[in-house]
């Protein structure tokens, strides 16, 4: 029977509904097939927590998840220092989760085996030191950046992306930083 309990929101997103999640057990179709989860986040903010313990429980459900790729979520940015370098904290955080995973204490999967961070490409050439610092902080795991270009005139729809400029992709400084971001191709 479906749950009719209303969703609650204690942070940026709706809170997990354990009653709803428990309604269906997913069948493991091919438990021997190796899987890399290509996109996940970790955070502890606004009363909501999803860290390595929660991820390990989710990927340890019977599927053969052998590795994961962490994708930036504006999580664990540095609280101080130059604004441009604050996203470096998220790469350091994801690399720390990868080190925890390497201990074997969270299951066999290589959690955060790949890391996708963020650099403000509107900085143009000034984004280069950020990218270089993220490559170092990723300890061989850094794979690229994500600079969201989502935009909507309605702040209610745009949510946390409401501050993004309209028409971001053709902005000259944004495009100028792209060659620096391709260094590791």
Regions found by a protein language model. Give the residues of each.
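Helix-coil boundary/capping segments in enzymes
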Residues: 2-185
């Amino acid at each position: 029977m479906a749950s009719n309990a209303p969703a609650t929101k204690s942070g940026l997103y709706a809170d997990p509904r354990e009653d709803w999640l428990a309604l269906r057990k997913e069948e493991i179709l091919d438990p021997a097939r190796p899987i890399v989860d290509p996109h996940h986040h970790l955070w502890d903010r606004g009363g909501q927590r999803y860290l390595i313990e929660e991820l390990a429980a989710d990927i340890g459900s019977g599927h053969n998840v052998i590795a994961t790729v962490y994708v930036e979520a504006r999580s664990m940015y540095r609280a101080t220092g130059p604004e441009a370098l604050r996203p470096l904290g998220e790469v350091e955080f994801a690399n720390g989760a990868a080190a925890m995973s390497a201990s074997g204490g969270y299951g066999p999967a290589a959690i955060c085996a790949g890391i996708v961070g963020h650099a403000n490409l509107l900085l143009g050439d000034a984004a280069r030191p950020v990218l270089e610092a993220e490559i170092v902080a990723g300890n061989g795991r850094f794979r690229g950046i994500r600079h969201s270009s989502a935009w909507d005139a309605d702040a209610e729809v745009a949510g946390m992306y409401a501050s993004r400029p309209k028409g971001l992709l053709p902005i000259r400084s944004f495009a100028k930083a792209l060659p620096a971001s391709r260094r590791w191709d």
